[in-house]
Amino acid sequence: MATRGRHRSRTSGTSSEPMTLRAPPDERDLDSLRSFGVVNLDKPPGPSAHQVAAWIRDATGQDRVAHGGTLDPKVTGCLPVLLGDAARMAQVFDNAVKEYVTVLELHDQAPADIADIVAEFETDIYQKPPRKSAVKRQLRSRRIHSLDILEQGDRRLLLRVRCASGTYIRKLCHDIGLAAGTGAHMGDLRRTATGTFDDGSLSTMHDLVDALAFAADGDEAQLREIIQPAERALSHLPRVTIAPSAAREVAEGAPVYAPGVIETGPAEVGDATPEIDSQVVSVTPDGAAVCLGTLVSDPDADSGLVVELDRMLV
């Protein structure tokens, strides 16, 4: 970790009243959580991810929400929903590693070497988006980080897939069936993790509605467990801590300059470190997110641009 002993910053604006920055993540009131929070939702089967996000928007009284990675209507599981200003950070899920549990339905009895066949797909694979996809149908590479058989029957496998964002699990199941010589299709599919969110902290729509009702009666405990500070979605990114005066300049649209940098450090979750051209989150000394940006130069320099602004979060 690089630490700086000086907290100089450029003067900002002409107002005599400095703007108020967000409170530390663990000290926010419920209104602040609702306007800059994230719900790790257990998406039910049936509605689309967009429909579910709209329900949460209406239930929480926010003008805007976003979700962290779409799920088809029949797919269940981990769907982080970003509330209010947190919707600006939805891009952090674009390249997040995803994990799924799926049923592989073989069209004939599994061959004796099915485990070896499955293991061959734990690599970079090539896929073309399906005809109904919203993206251009061109061949592209996707990494399968791990592929484990959790259960096995004569014609059915329960698989856990950890993969790059944008992997088509249905196509993966089809290709495994071809390699096995039996043919196969995907059965049930559930997402168990996306980025730093997993199925260990999921909440249902019913949980959220009940918690909102309790909060309206003065009991905030359940809602505070469900709506997490938005910074939770950024814990996999390297951090650049900046002075409050520099944070106020960012709020006015300025990037982060070297004199305003206090220190840099690795991600709270994972092993990402602040490298040139890497995505970083700039935070205040008490941990409140200020902006997403790209580290463009040495943060220990005496002058110059350090973090180019991608998304303002204040």
UniProtKB/Swiss-Prot annotation:
Active site positions, chain numbering: D72
E.C. code: 5.4.99.25
Comp. bias regions, Basic residues: 1-10
Record keywords: Isomerase, tRNA processing
Domain PUA intervals: 237-314
GO MF annotation terms: RNA binding; tRNA pseudouridine(55) synthase activity
Annotated stretches, region: Disordered: 1-30
Family: Belongs to the pseudouridine synthase TruB family. Type 2 subfamily.
PANTHER family, A to Z: CENTROMERE/MICROTUBULE BINDING PROTEIN CBF5 (PTHR23127), H_ACA RIBONUCLEOPROTEIN COMPLEX SUBUNIT DKC1 (PTHR23127:SF0)
Physiological role: Could be responsible for synthesis of pseudouridine from uracil-55 in the psi GC loop of transfer RNAs.
Protein's name in the database: Probable tRNA pseudouridine synthase B
Native source organism of the sequence: Haloarcula marismortui (strain ATCC 43049 / DSM 3752 / JCM 8966 / VKM B-1809) (Halobacterium marismortui)
Gene assigned in the entry: truB
